[in-house]
Amino acid sequence: YGDKSDWMYMLVRTDPSASKQKGISLLVVDMASPGIEARPIDLISGKSSFCQVFFDNVKVPKDHLIGPLHGGWTLAKALLQHERRAMSKFGEFSLPNHFDLLELAERYLPPAASSSLAEAGLRARAIATAMDEHAYKLTTQRMGEEMRARQNVSGVMSIMKLVHSEQEKDKFEVLLDLMGHRALGWEGDAFEAEELAVARAWLGSFAQTIAGGSSEVQLNVIAKRVLELPEGKQAK
């Protein structure tokens, strides 16, 4: 939403001689500053929430520095935790689940007595996915209680974000199998509004495995911060 934002934050290299994360600072930038151009990126889901932001000789006042000079990396990690928290649906304003798997299975599949073996297998997948989703919701409630008690759950954030984004992708794969061609509509009166929403949400689910840190990045974070596995060494 860079094209709609009034401000943005950015990590800038303020000490070229420092290595890796050191020498990075966090700035907030007024999007109305001369030389800034935000260009929306068209996504396969039909939305354009992502943008490319171009800077042409943009000047930012020194008092827009957040935190200590060269200390931006620590702040950036904290910001990422908030983003992962939101994407894991820990927040009190998380969106409700609009696509009930078992309800859609009842609507789009024939009665069990006349279903084929493949449809029986699909029913089992739908039930298993619904159970996983319910278990995840219970876990997020427990995690929310631990967060309110100010317990350290920073590493667990990556686990929950990883599980949620991968579960969402798998859920929509099951939805497509449940609904068949009815889940592949893009527009027009031949499809119900819910069917059109499923198609776009399915395409959008792929972005969830990238936003807030890709699934591969989350696995690395979990390995180092949660499991405390040695870095850069291979098990023999």
Question: Language-model segments: which ranges?
Answer:
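Glycine-rich beta->alpha junctions and the first turn(s) of the following alpha-helix
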Residues: 35-136, 208
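A short core secondary-structure module
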Residues: 1-39
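Alpha-helical scaffold segments that form or flank carboxylate-/histidine-based iron centers
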Residues: 120-128, 153-163, 199-204
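Glycine-rich phosphate/cofactor-binding loops in nucleotide/flavin-utilizing enzymes
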Residues: 75-91, 179-236
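C-terminal helix-coil-helix/basic helical segment that borders enzyme active sites and/or dimer interfaces
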Residues: 110-113, 117, 134-190
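Short, well-ordered loop/turn and helix-capping segments at boundaries between secondary-structure elements
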Residues: 13-17, 30, 34, 56, ...
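Tryptophan-centric aromatic hotspots in well-structured domains and transmembrane helices
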Residues: 7-9, 26, 50-54, 73-75, ...
